[in-house]
């Protein structure tokens, strides 16, 4: 049953009647929970206290306490959990800690928990959290993110069969199936599908926990149909009447990956532990057609506050109104004001990021170090750039919304929207790179005069009507004009040269004349 309610569409479009699921109408209010010191968290395994302290955690945030009570506490994980909480509120530990605690008593190593995220960077960050707490209770954590070759991943995830080690032994007396080396796997959809399809011994048969992080993005993009595949493979065998996926195509999985019922596996008549799901986002979708893909069981929504969209409580929002042709100069002056503090600068496109980064290179003696962060760069280049930014070797990172999802940078105090975000969800994910884990932070947004009204209206959806106007000294902007004119000419020459090189190499190059017209925006 769904209830139709008059509301705005998910991305801030025109009003329409969008159906809402009944269980979303009465959420548990995360803000009603207080922080809890580590030593006072009920039923916490004592072995986990020291690892948490080494992580610098002295007290748990409300979202972590709420999730704990619904999984380890009275809730006992009887319902699937949906968490809608601002960026930087502590959602990763909110699911990692209960999963580690629940698996701490396992006797036999099997793949029991799967965490799926949209990007490699996010997955590696989540794995770091599990790595910090899981080993102390005897659990092994693996990753399948494409950081290394699939052969290397297989060697880290799967134990070779005894037949391979002792080929002369009679098959009747040895275990033929390769066994997993990990209890918990953090994966990206593409590499997960690779292992499901091709890796012998990779099985979801014993899976007890499935976490879908950044849920709205994971449901919006198909990602090789990973979700229906995982859902089908984790149903018990009496539920699997067909070997066809949603498109009617045959699935290429070994039979051992199908989850057998408890009776089949010798559980003395007891049902197999159900697959518990946790889905999380700072902007969780309310679309029933999307949520139905998850096949949630009696779901419980944990929501931060009454508003659907929330920004961190310690975030200060500012807007800067300027003409398009002065935006690059205004950005430089603002960055000078921030005095070399770490800062993320978001643009509307990869091309815009590249233009802006290239333009800044033609300004000499800037008092800050900057770098471009783009999907067009090699993965190794992006990784080195991000590491340099985290280590303080780079002050300013310029990129697109690829940087806006889940990436955590310690000590990041400032975010700048060089281009106005198109949707409130975009603003939340961008601004949420700062003011994390109870720290303070600031987000500046450059606006043209005609954008101000729409921007103010957008922020109201995020329960944020206090966005101050920030002014820059006009004389500081004017002093940069002579250099700006020279830099623009050099930029045009540089872009023309790049286009020529790409044309000769056969790469598809963006239209050079279009680049010229948009260099100031």
From Swiss-Prot:
Superkingdom of origin organism: Eukaryota
Any one annotated GO CC term: nucleus
CDD domains assigned to the protein according to its UniProt record, in alphabetical order: DEADc_DDX51, SF2_C_DEAD
Motif interval(s): DEAD box: 213-216
Entries under PROSITE patterns matching the protein: HELICASE_ATP_BIND_1, HELICASE_CTER
GO MF terms held by the record: ATP binding; ATP hydrolysis activity; RNA binding; RNA helicase activity
Name assigned to this protein: DEAD-box ATP-dependent RNA helicase 1
